[in-house]
Design a protein with these regions (language model features):
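Short, hinge-like loop/turn segments at secondary-structure boundaries
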Residues: 5-9, 84-85, 105-109, 159-161
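NAD(P)-dependent Rossmann-like dehydrogenase/reductase catalytic/cofactor-binding core
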Residues: 135-136, 186-261
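Rossmann-like NAD(P)(H) cofactor-binding subdomain of soluble oxidoreductases
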Residues: 13-104
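Active-site-proximal catalytic alpha-helix in oxidoreductases
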Residues: 148-176, 180-193, 220
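A general structural signal for well-ordered alpha-helical segments in protein cores
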Residues: 34, 46, 75-76, 127, ...
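Glycine-rich phosphate-binding loop and adjoining beta1-alpha1-beta2 segment
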Residues: 1-15
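Helix-loop-beta segment of a Rossmann-like dinucleotide-binding subdomain
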Residues: 35, 57-60, 104-115, 166-177, ...
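Rossmann-fold dinucleotide-binding core
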Residues: 32, 69-150, 154
């Protein structure tokens, strides 16, 4: 009833309820409605969303692309049960948001452009149009053939910061001011690099030490006052995405024989 608003950094937008459609049931959506479907839910809903989209494929246009805007890694797997590799893509978002009210999204931190690509080596050129549309809204967006590297870069960042920020009830920056929390974050970073090296994946840095230099000199200072999405979930008493963050590292550690205990 209050519409939708985007505030904070960049251009502000507001939309009244008569400027968009909300569907309460898939059956209410006309056939061939969507060129793109953005998956912006918490990752715990992916099994249900992927299944229901598959059951209602008639609402998707023939060349519809599903783009997953979520924390974590391998979030495309539930959708690949029902859709082909050239229909499912992932986004790397390293922009901070908060939701002061249910209808307001506030951009609190911006570090790098949104990146769109495929974890299955599909050509991302088909996403150029939607990347341009997102950029036109005020948040820069680009495509990449190396989305896996960038998603692992975000995993390094989120897995080191999010759980501790919740447990210690503090911002990202405060975590770097205590030697005990720094030691824990350093250990998490080491574990993730060990998993990456044993797996078929790669990231943007050659070693944990190389990443740590950037982490403490730029990445955390740039987001010093930010509270993680995991922290916000706990405050709202809703399920977190920890299973697709640190939980993914644990599962891959077990798969590749890396001690992440």
């Amino acid at each position: 009833e209050n519409g939708l608003e985007r505030t904070g950094l960049f251009q502000h937008y507001s939309f009244t309820p008569d400027e968009y459609h909300i569907y309460e049931d898939y059956k209410d959506i006309p056939e061939k409605t969507f060129d793109y479907v953005f998956i912006c839910s918490k990752t715990v809903a992916n099994d249900d969303i992927s299944r229901k989209l598959a059951e209602n494929k008639e609402i998707l246009k023939d060349n519809c692309k599903i783009i997953i805007f979520q924390n974590g890694f391998a979030n495309d797997e539930p959708f690949l049960r029902y859709f082909s590799e050239d229909e499912v893509y992932c986004a790397r978002v390293i922009t901070g948001f908060s939701r002061p009210q249910r209808h307001i999204s506030e951009i609190t931190v911006y570090t790098e452009p949104i990146l769109l690509g495929s974890l299955q080596n599909a050509d991302p050129k088909c996403l150029e149009k939607i990347a341009q549309m997102i950029s036109a809204s005020g948040i820069k967006c680009e495509t990449t053939t190396e989305i896996d590297k960038y998603l692992w870069a975000k995993m390094l960042y989120n897995c080191a910061l999010n759980p501790l920020g919740v447990i210690l009830n503090c911002t990202y920056g405060k975590l770097t001011e205590n030697e005990y929390s720094k030691n824990i974050m350093d250990s998490i970073i080491d574990e993730i690099f060990a998993v990456i090296k044993k797996s078929e994946y790669s990231t943007l840095w050659n070693s944990a030490d190389e990443y740590r230099k950037l982490f403490y000199s730029k990445l955390v200072p740039d987001t010093y006052n930010h509270y993680s999405s995991t922290y916000q979930d706990i405050q709202k008493k809703i399920k977190t995405e920890i299973d697709t963050l640190n939980g993914t590292v644990i599962r891959l550690g077990e798969k590749y024989g890396v001690d992440v205990s």
